A protein has these predicted regions:
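Short secondary-structure boundary/capping segments
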Residues: 29-31, 71-74, 122, 139-141
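Short, well-ordered coil/turn elements that cap or connect secondary structure elements
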Residues: 50, 81-83, 117
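Leloir-type glycosyltransferase catalytic cores
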Residues: 135-212
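A donor-sugar binding/catalytic signature common to diverse glycosyltransferases
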Residues: 90-136
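Short, glycine-/Ser/Thr-/acidic-enriched flexible segments
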Residues: 20, 62, 111, 129, ...
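Conserved catalytic-core segment of nucleotide-activated headgroup transferases in glycan assembly
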Residues: 1-72
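Alpha-helix C-cap/termination motif
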Residues: 47-51, 79, 100
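Nucleotide-activated donor-binding/catalytic signature segment of Leloir-type glycosyltransferases, i.e.
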Residues: 71-89
Length: 212
């Protein structure tokens, strides 16, 4: 982390990987596998990224016992002449990485949504609910490597979209607290009343940007 936060500050792109069996990869992307995604991203980076930038592949913490991409990353570095410009990491703190990276490339991981909350440029390569004009980079991956330095997500649009998702798609509760009334099952806290004004504004703003 020290190297990423100092010598490589604002000089690296982050590629947070999803679990190999993630249905979002299987059904909502054009990639045959996470490994296929890695190969295509590295190929694009090698051909189009500025020579002083580094690509950092971050393994999903829940997939480490099942898949090891270290050998693949090593082979890709040799194939594309990316010695010292292609790294593979595991346990680094994501919010800290967001603050030091140039941008993130994801398939459709929720990590992309988290990166947007930090005002970081994000390029999605699959179908994602947050892949909206004004939030994510809408041009090609090949163009992202150069344009990420000037592209920024719209903070007002993100705030509205986040509020809309929380209001319409989330339930306040916990799987880890005791059950309500002593009965079986997870504890579901009472939801707060919806803020219909915020929801309507959020929906309208999202729709406006999506149609531009």
């Amino acid at each position: 982390m020290e190297v990423l936060a100092s010598r490589l500050h604002k000089k690296f792109f982050l590629v947070p990987l999803q679990i190999s069996g993630d249905s979002q990869v299987m059904h909502h992307s054009r990639y045959a596998s996470v490994a296929d995604f890695v190969c295509r991203v590295v190929e694009s980076f090698a051909a189009h990224a500025p020579a002083d930038t580094t690509l950092v592949i971050k393994h999903h913490p829940l997939d480490r016992g099942y898949h090891d991409y270290g050998a693949l990353v090593f082979d890709l570095a040799k194939k594309h002449g990316l010695k010292n410009r292609l790294l593979c990491i595991h346990d680094q703190h994501l919010p800290t990485l967001f603050d030091h990276m140039l941008g993130a490339v994801v398939i459709n991981s929720t990590v992309g949504f988290s990166a947007l909350s930090h005002g970081a440029p994000v390029k999605t390569c699959g179908l994602a609910i947050y892949d909206i004009q004004g939030l994510t980079f809408q041009e090609s991956l090949d163009e992202f490597w150069e344009d990420a330095q000037i592209f920024r997500p719209n903070p007002e649009l993100f705030a509205r979209f986040r509020a809309y998702v929380i209001d319409h798609k989330q339930i306040a509760g916990s799987f880890y607290k005791g059950p309500i009334g002593g009965g079986p099952g997870a504890s579901i806290a009472a939801s707060t009343p919806r803020n219909h004004a915020t929801s309507s504004l959020g929906a309208a703003l999202v729709a406006t940007h999506a149609n531009e």
